[in-house]
A protein has these predicted regions:
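Alpha/beta enzyme core
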Residues: 2, 9-37, 53-63, 76-171
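A glycine-rich helix N-cap at a beta->alpha junction
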Residues: 62-72
Length: 171
């Protein structure tokens, strides 16, 4: 999947982030360029991000052949907020992530590998619970181990496999 991430704010946002009108103009440009997968936001990053997603949903601006993606951390209240933002958006890609690298595990979270893996599993459980709560069966799940390059390869694989197991896609 070639997914444009030009619309998403977060820690790599522009010094002066785009406002809703600018995001709308950029979204329409990406459609005109032929993108079929577009990351439209990180709803917990700002109210502008949330409002932009709601605008796209309420005005039904997403063509039926386009999949939009949203990003959220594996945290219950943030996943719930993301579901509020995507209400009315068909077939969204929900991209969840959590930090898995050694530095963040030790310094930020003071957590073991097992505890970090559980954050990812709990993220998937929350997505599934929100799917029931919001009456959604069309969510496409994407998971990323944040800061993958600083994560031991065996652990990154272990976490991704645990996510697949919880989602019900074990190979």
């Amino acid at each position: 999947i070639w997914c444009s991430v030009d619309l998403r704010d977060g820690n790599q946002a522009l010094v002066e982030p785009m406002v809703v009108e600018e995001k709308t103009e950029m979204f329409n440009l990406l459609l005109k360029l032929g993108f079929k997968e577009i990351e439209i936001g990180f709803p917990e990053a700002s109210q502008i991000e949330f409002d932009f997603l709601r605008l796209l949903a309420l005005r039904k601006m997403i063509p039926s052949d386009v999949h939009v993606q949203v990003l959220t951390q594996c945290r219950e209240h943030l996943i719930h907020r993301t579901f509020e933002a995507i209400e009315g958006i068909p077939n969204p890609i929900l991209h969840i992530y959590n930090s898995t690298n050694t530095l963040q595990r030790d310094v930020v979270f003071h957590a073991s590998r097992e505890e970090i893996k559980q954050i990812a599993i709990d993220g998937v459980k929350t997505v599934k619970a929100c799917m029931k709560e919001f009456g959604r069966d069309d969510i496409i799940l994407e998971y990323s181990p944040e800061s993958f390059m600083g994560t031991e390869l065996d652990f990154a694989l272990e976490v991704c496999e645990a996510v697949l197991d919880e989602w019900g896609m074990a190979t």
